[in-house]
Amino acid sequence: MSQRPPTRRAAAPAEVPFTRNTLALIYDFDGTLTPQPMQEYTVFPQLGIAPEDFWAEVNAETRLTGGDSILTYMRLLVEKIEANKAHLSRAALRRLASGIRYFPGVETWFERINRYVATRSGGLVQARHYIVSAGLSEILEGISIKHHFERVYASQYHFNHHEVACFPTIVINDTSKTQYLFRINKGRETPGESINEYMPEAQRPIPFGHMVYLGDGLTDVPCMTVTKNYGGFAIAVHNPANPASLEVCRALVAAERIDYFALADYRSGRKLEKRVRTILDVIIARVAFEREKHLFKAEMGAL
């Protein structure tokens, strides 16, 4: 009598891991983390340029030519460097970044936020920090807080074989900033990678609903709008030394561009930290809900 071969059990379906457990805090730089534009701590003192004169010249030429204000300032800065017969290489610009001064509490902010997210989520969620700035990448490469950031996106010069800045290779202005939100959203964080191909929402590593954008003014409106329209959050900060910045924040609230604003004081226990933590709590709850839903679908064999 022939024996029936043993029945083989069907292999259990491979477990699909839950990977959308990252939140992103995305910062403008000038006026958000620092009281003044980065050039005013670095290049201008080196060249003896009066900030108010330089920015007035940029604004006048932009109005006259109808050109892009960021391209205009980058070109004028190269001309000023040449006129002063200065040699500001990439390395020199990085060194000048040591003169940048931050709002109170910025240096300890990132580690505090990381600890809060890890503790509050029981280790489920990790925080990442990004800079998206119209300022100069060559300066931002030298900032003392750079190691806290996953990526730093900023305008950039081409340097010739003499290490002289010749022309811009990357220009980030108010509206082009938004492409970097989609890079973070899709996990295509290297500038050369295309972000135009369709990617299903479920495959995007950092949903917009897990993002917080922090800025200081009207130049941040495109990023604030995109972030909020796609389910994320936006906060504005104002400089206590500049009363006009508070009025800008009030206008942003009235236009529903932001969720909150606060004084640019990043120290522990201050209003900015409390309001950011409130948003982080919402995102952490979202991630927990999404993870449980993922596990439920796995149980149902629906993944």
Model-derived segments and spans:
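Alpha-helical substrate-recognition element adjacent to the catalytic core
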Residues: 2-161, 252, 256-260
